[in-house]
Amino acid sequence: FQFKPDGSVLAIGRRGGGKAQLLKSKPPYKRWERRDLDRYIGGPLLMKWGDRYIAGGRKSGAALVGKRGPKTALYWLNAEAKTEQDHLTEFAELPSNGDTSYPGFVELSPTRAFVSWYSSHEKDADGKSITAIYMADLEIQK
């Protein structure tokens, strides 16, 4: 959830294996506006970075045609877009595969942030998949 200065709230909701939804509400939060996004987002993240919103989570299915397994990705969110296709713009696919999701995000400045996620894309010395937590330092070049 992200609360705006006017008290309204913005959220991303996962809907099983279907398309995620953008959720909006105003106090007292009894009525919610729901809009389908154009893709599935597992373990969704929604954060404010500078003057923009970012969303993140696991992508799978049609989003990965020609690729192997689920990936964790980050998107710019345009909460005011009028069509499904205009809400999300992917800007990063994190090193990931298999069991992967739940990105975390810490804004350090309007142009720099840390992101964390877990993934099972690496193998141990015996060739068995391991699940590990990863962190990346992101910087926006202006």
Model-predicted segments: where are they?
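Signature of short aromatic-glycine-proline-rich micro-motifs recurring in repeat-based ectodomains
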Residues: Y102-G104
